[in-house]
């Protein structure tokens, strides 16, 4: 249910997975009560061997009996150990970072350098050539294609100061090998690690990008690294092309630029900042022609004559089309570059008059360079400016929280101006807000379903304890693997909660079945009888539980060694389920019997008091 409530890109990514599991569970349930019984009748022939004679079952029960007997002797200690494990997990949980989604490796690096507004075409072309040459020097790079400027379409609003370079990589099998660092290993284990894992390892994606970023730290250029599809989605969703961005809203562009520059200086001091760039909203350069109407009239010219000369000689005019085979190209005419590349040359451009005279343009207009907005952003009916922040080595949530504290302490935002944190952080906050009320609602629905099944609040609560206890293993495995909390991780945790609750239900059903049967047979007169019933019921659950864990582990462990596109997302889903199944097994086989014993013993004690009977205590705890 929580996955179906996700929206936007996270919903499109994970809803198919949820639909697949839902349909699979539905048809599996349907077939288990229709096809499976029929096949059992047809295929299971001859004498059926009792479970007590099954060697696997006998082996598992032999291992489990000492455990459950110890648990029933030290019930409170067992529960205390479980609670202590949960408490010890809290620091690890708090140290987990947060992000929207793990990086989805597309196999292509998208490099987006940003310069100050006003860069010329010649400078931009030269800069692209230098950057492409540096990128192509890396042995992992197959080919590089860079561009500056944009197409004449509203779907590509990139300014000329923002370049885009596509870096296509070779297959990972052809990447460089680096020495494996095992300095943190104990000295006796290092040779074993070299023997089993090898003395070298391939360079990682993050290390390759870090080397490229270091090689491309050019003066006046702010680097941003992403991937093509991810970049397009981010740009269309929020307009921010980096993991984190700040949108500044206000009535005056000049003030917005000042706030952006101040934010740029402050954010550079935040640990984990790779590059930060505030848009120079008013940093565009313009060539202004202020026409002298009296001078134009004195020479018998009109404003249109002068403007046409400026447009044709300087901007160029298409006069014809040349046909080259099946191809056609427009032919434009304008002054040579050396006659129009500075203001002095423009002042010498000659404007013909009706009587054949040639008048310098400088006598008919004042020509000067001015600055102004390179582009005007408007969002939510307000002027805006963006600050782009590219970060490395930190989780997005932790970085933004620290950055917010520094900005609040060092940046004074004037009245009428507001800051909005955007980028992937905006997605993360949106998903977090949605899950914050959907997950508790889902747990409430599960509790209601459990109560409808058991008709007991106590049993329902015992089953729900499976969820927090299963989180212990999930959190610790995430911590050791260095994974951040993300939507993918929460999807795995939600799936883990369902499996943990399911195994808890089966354990309670087995314990109840033996308890009720012995109660009907009159064999429930003491706590010793209760413990023997619990041992018998729990022992019946060992093999099904181990089969469930083995099947889930067999299906999930290969994901942890997978590579390629999508592997990083799938690992985040599988990791909490793998870690959680370990602690869920301990809970089901140890903690639930202890809690069940305390609850039933308390009920028997009060029942005995009400009937005036005294319950004895038997030490006969062996399974017959």
What are the residue ranges of the model-derived segments?
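A short beta-strand structural signal in non-transmembrane regions
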Residues: 112, 165-167, 176-185, 190-209, ...
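Hydrophobic transmembrane alpha-helices and their membrane-interface caps
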Residues: 5, 23, 31, 445-541, ...
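Interfacial helix-loop-helix hairpins and adjacent transmembrane helices
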Residues: 9, 15, 34-86, 117-123, ...
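Extracytoplasmic/periplasmic membrane-proximal domains and adjacent transmembrane bundles
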Residues: 224-226, 245, 257-260, 264-442, ...
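Transmembrane helices with small-residue packing motifs
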Residues: 3-13, 48, 83-119, 170-176, ...
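Signature of alpha-helical transmembrane segments and their immediate interfacial
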Residues: 1, 52-102, 135-136, 142, ...
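Solvent-exposed, membrane-proximal periplasmic/extracellular interface segments of envelope transport
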Residues: 122-236, 240, 265, 294-316, ...
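Transmembrane alpha-helices and their membrane-interface boundaries in multi-pass membrane transporters
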Residues: 1-6, 13-51, 165, 469, ...
């Amino acid at each position: 249910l929580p996955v179906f409530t996700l929206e936007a890109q996270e919903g499109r990514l994970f809803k198919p997975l949820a639909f697949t599991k839902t349909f699979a569970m539905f048809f599996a349930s349907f077939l288990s009560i229709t096809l499976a019984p029929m096949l059992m009748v047809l295929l299971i022939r001859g004498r059926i061997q009792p479970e007590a004679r099954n060697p696997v079952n006998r082996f598992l029960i032999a291992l489990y009996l000492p455990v459950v007997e110890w648990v029933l002797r030290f019930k409170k200690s067992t529960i205390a150990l479980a609670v202590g494990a949960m408490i010890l997990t809290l620091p690890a949980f708090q140290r987990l970072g947060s992000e929207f989604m793990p990086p989805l490796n597309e196999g292509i690096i998208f490099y987006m350098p940003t310069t100050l507004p006003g860069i010329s075409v010649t400078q931009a072309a030269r800069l692209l050539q230098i950057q492409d040459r540096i990128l192509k020097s890396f042995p992992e790079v197959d080919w590089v294609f860079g561009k500056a400027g944009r197409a004449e379409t509203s779907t590509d609003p990139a300014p000329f100061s923002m370049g885009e370079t596509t870096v296509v990589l070779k297959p990972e099998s052809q990447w460089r090998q680096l020495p494996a660092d095992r300095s943190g290993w104990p000295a006796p284990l290092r040779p074993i690690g070299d023997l089993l894992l090898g003395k070298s390892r391939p360079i990682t994606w993050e290390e390759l990008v870090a080397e490229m970023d270091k090689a491309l730290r050019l003066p006046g250029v702010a680097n941003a690294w992403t991937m093509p599809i991810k970049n397009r989605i981010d740009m269309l969703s929020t307009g921010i092309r980096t993991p984190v961005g700040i949108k500044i809203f206000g009535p005056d562009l000049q003030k917005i630029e000042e706030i952006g520059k101040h934010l740029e200086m402050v954010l550079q001091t935040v640990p984990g900042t790779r590059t930060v760039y505030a848009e120079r909203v008013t940093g565009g350069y313009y060539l202004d022609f202020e026409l002298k109407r009296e001078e134009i009239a004195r020479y018998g010219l009109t404003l249109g004559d002068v403007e046409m000369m400026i447009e044709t000689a300087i901007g160029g005019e298409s006069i014809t089309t040349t046909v080259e085979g099946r191809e056609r190209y427009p032919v434009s005419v304008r002054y040579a570059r050396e006659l129009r590349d500075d203001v002095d040359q423009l002042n010498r451009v000659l404007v013909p008059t009706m009587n054949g005279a040639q008048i310098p343009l400088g006598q008919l207009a004042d020509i000067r360079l001015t600055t102004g907005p390179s582009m005007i952003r408007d969002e939510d009916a307000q002027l805006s400016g963006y600050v782009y922040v590219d970060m490395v080595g930190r989780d997005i949530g932790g970085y933004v929280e620290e950055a917010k504290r520094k900005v609040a302490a060092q940046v004074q935002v004037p009245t009428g101006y507001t800051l909005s944190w955007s980028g992937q952080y905006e997605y993360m906050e949106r998903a977090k807000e949605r899950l914050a009320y959907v997950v508790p609602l889902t747990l409430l629905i599960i509790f209601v379903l459990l109560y409808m099944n058991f008709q007991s609040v106590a049993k329902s609560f015992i089953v729900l304890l499976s969820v927090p206890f299963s989180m212990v293993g999930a959190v610790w495995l995430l911590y050791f693997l260095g994974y951040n909390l993300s939507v993918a991780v929460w999807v795995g945790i939600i799936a883990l909660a369902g499996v943990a609750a399911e195994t808890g239900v089966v354990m309670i059903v087995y314990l109840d079945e033996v308890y009720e049967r012995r109660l009907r047979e009159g064999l429930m007169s003491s706590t010793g009888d209760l413990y023997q019933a619990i041992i018998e019921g729990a022992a019946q659950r060992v093999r099904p539980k181990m089969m469930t864990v083995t099947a889930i582990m067999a299906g999930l462990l290969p994901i942890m060694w997978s590579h390629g596109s999508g592997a990083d997302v799938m690992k985040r889903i599988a990791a909490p389920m793998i870690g959680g199944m370990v602690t869920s097994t301990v809970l089901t086989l140890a903690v639930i019997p202890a809690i069940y014993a305390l609850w039933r013993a308390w009920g028997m004690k009060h029942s005995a008091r009400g009937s005036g009977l005294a319950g004895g205590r038997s030490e006969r705890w062996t399974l017959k």
